[in-house]
């Protein structure tokens, strides 16, 4: 029975004191982790003598909406071990400087009687010494220095640069402000007060989804994770939610228990795939091909064979499908051109911002109308007309936009479309009408909807090089065509497209795509986004609870934006902030442009101004244009 004596004997239980002392705490502090994470989880930080001893998830989140599950539990493995980062022996908690630079600077400073600015100037004037510390880059050799030493060298180099080149040659970069608003603002304010330049960040490391400003004119406007529960069809595309959205993954699982179909598109069976009803292992970078085939099926079965009223109304009201595009002939080939402006027709002669207002046709009268949702109405003097109401912005008359000229057209023109995947071109029939411009010319125009039908290979009885069926591999964008790129069978595409569209029809748009930085980091990743968004728009999913395109990366938003930006950019001193787009700055100054050619080297696009200029030429042109 000696083991009983061991249990009750105080002498044999002293080891317990080690654990009691390890987990003792003086107080509990509520906090979160500023690690560029959108989780924003609330943590109970247990502190002893000013040192974090352990962390625990808070359990007091308010349940403000009983239609969705509670937000708890929130947290992740990274969060609960965050104190290990704080007290890690490899965490750098002090300034370090390359020994080669430190020795050279101190020697010059001593020779200059202690003047740091003169010392830096002499160091820069000596090419041999300058090259010595430059060649040391990438080879280690760091030494710990005092804060005063580091700050003195930074200040001296800044003053020298201002005196010799001007303050706008001092460039600063930091990751996204929401990661640490105070840290970012202090550095940015320092730069702005002396005329320096801040580089952009969100776009530089490819977190900003370019498709969003291209389509909607905003940066990243997505739903919060609780809205996943209201969806009835979720596609996780290039987003490993179990790893990158750990505090929110429970909404994904709970939505599935609530009857939501969950699909994961990923080359590998990732952490999130185990939460899904279906795993689609498309080849990396082929998501766009898959979605274009899905849209082909949606247009065929839900816009042509059967016109779903909700889809048709949404397409008219919330997309640019009714807008008119001029068709232009070049070397005997007809190509889609620019959208037609109201300034080009005499009916709207003298309209303010006419170059930024575009045309629809009223389905009832056949008259030209000017929709109010365009940029021209946003910036004109008369306010209150920048909306999506079906009223002519110039006359106020109600109208019903014409989506297609299929039943009422003046002509059918063979228009050339380019398919870059297989480097092919096709001539396809497009119904057109003729509009007489101010100068008396008759210009053929087509709706974006009709051009989209032709682009996606839907003939609707028109002549041209259209696919013969879903199984036609030689014509974009059939289910069989996408097999070449994705490795996914056409039957999977058909099932997916029909389930997506049927769910969107029944729920009026409660189908969503969750996407992460993986696809956004691909060359032309914006086109993969847009391929998916196309299917969403044509089934009325964007702007709906439980629907739309939801791109999650870091913490791109901060609450006190207006007041914070005043401090950050030193607007309180009356200065105009100097800001520079990060990608272009690095593209030019790192000589990356030297490795690119003209756009026409990479695709079979027709010769035009865009294709015949280098990206660097366009960057220079943008600067010249202000």
Enumerate the predicted regions with their spans.
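A glycine-rich, hydrophobic/aromatic-adjacent loop/helix-cap motif
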Residues: 466, 473-474, 480, 492, ...
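N-terminal export/assembly segments and adjacent metallocofactor-ligating motifs
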Residues: 1-443, 450-461, 468, 477-480, ...
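Short polybasic/polar patches that bind polyanions
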Residues: 192, 484, 537
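Short, contiguous, pocket-lining structural segments
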Residues: 444, 485-488, 527
């Amino acid at each position: 029975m000696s083991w009983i004596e061991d249990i009750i004997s105080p002498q044999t239980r002293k080891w317990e004191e080690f654990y009691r002392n390890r987990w003792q705490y003086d107080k509990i502090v509520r906090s979160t982790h500023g690690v560029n994470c959108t989780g924003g989880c609330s943590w109970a930080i247990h502190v002893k003598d000013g040192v974090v001893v352990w962390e625990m998830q808070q359990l007091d989140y308010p349940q403000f909406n009983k239609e969705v599950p509670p937000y708890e539990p929130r947290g992740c493995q990274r969060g609960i071990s965050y104190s290990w980062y704080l007290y890690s022996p490899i965490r750098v908690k002090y300034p370090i400087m390359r020994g080669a630079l430190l020795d050279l600077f101190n020697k010059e400073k001593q020779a200059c009687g202690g003047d740091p600015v003169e010392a830096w100037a002499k160091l820069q004037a000596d090419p041999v010494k300058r090259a010595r510390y430059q060649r040391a880059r990438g080879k280690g050799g760091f030494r710990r220095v005092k804060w005063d030493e580091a700050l003195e060298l930074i200040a001296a180099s800044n003053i020298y640069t201002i005196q010799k080149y001007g303050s706008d040659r001092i460039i600063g970069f930091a990751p996204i402000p929401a990661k640490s608003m105070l840290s970012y603002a202090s550095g940015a304010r320092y730069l702005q007060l002396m005329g320096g330049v801040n580089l952009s960040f969100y776009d530089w490391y490819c977190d900003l989804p370019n498709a969003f400003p291209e389509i909607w004119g905003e940066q990243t406007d997505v739903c919060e994770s609780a809205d996943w529960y209201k969806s009835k069809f979720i596609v996780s595309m290039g987003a490993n939610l179990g790893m990158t959205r750990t505090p929110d993954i429970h909404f994904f699982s709970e939505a599935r228990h609530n009857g939501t179909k969950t699909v994961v598109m990923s080359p590998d069976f990732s952490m999130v795939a185990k939460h899904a009803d279906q795993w689609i292992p498309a080849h990396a970078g082929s998501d766009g091909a898959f979605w274009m085939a899905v849209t082909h099926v949606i247009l065929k079965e839900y816009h042509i064979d059967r016109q779903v009223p909700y889809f048709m109304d949404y397409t008219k009201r919330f997309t640019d499908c009714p807008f008119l595009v001029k068709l232009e002939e070049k070397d005997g080939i007809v190509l889609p051109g620019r959208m037609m402006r109201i300034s080009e027709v005499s009916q709207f002669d003298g309209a303010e911002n006419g170059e930024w207002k575009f045309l629809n046709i009223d389905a009832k009268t056949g008259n030209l109308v000017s929709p109010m949702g365009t940029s021209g109405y946003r910036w004109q003097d008369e306010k209150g007309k920048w909306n999506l109401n079906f009223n002519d912005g110039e006359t106020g008359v109600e109208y019903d936009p014409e989506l297609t000229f299929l039943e009422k057209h003046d002509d059918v023109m063979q228009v050339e479309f380019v398919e870059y995947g297989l480097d092919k071109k096709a001539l396809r029939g497009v119904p057109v009408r003729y509009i007489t411009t101010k100068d008396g010319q008759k210009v053929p125009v087509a709706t974006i909807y009709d051009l989209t039908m032709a682009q996606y290979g839907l003939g609707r009885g028109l002549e041209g090089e259209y696919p013969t069926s879903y199984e036609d591999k030689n014509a974009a964008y059939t289910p069989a065509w996408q097999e070449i790129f994705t490795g996914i069978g056409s039957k999977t595409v058909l099932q997916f497209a029909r389930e997506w569209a049927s769910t969107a029809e029944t729920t009026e748009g409660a189908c969503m795509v969750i996407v992460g930085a993986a696809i956004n980091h691909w060359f032309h990743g914006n086109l993969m986004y847009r391929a998916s968004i196309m299917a969403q728009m044509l089934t009325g999913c964007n702007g709906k609870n439980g629907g739309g395109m939801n791109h999650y990366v870091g913490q791109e938003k901060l609450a006190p934006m207006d007041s914070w930006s005043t401090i950050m950019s030193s607007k309180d001193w009356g200065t105009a902030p100097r800001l520079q787009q990060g990608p272009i700055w690095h593209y030019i100054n790192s000589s990356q442009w030297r490795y690119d050619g003209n756009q026409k080297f990479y695709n079979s696009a027709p010769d035009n101004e865009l294709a015949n200029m280098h990206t660097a030429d366009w960057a220079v042109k943008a600067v010249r244009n202000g």
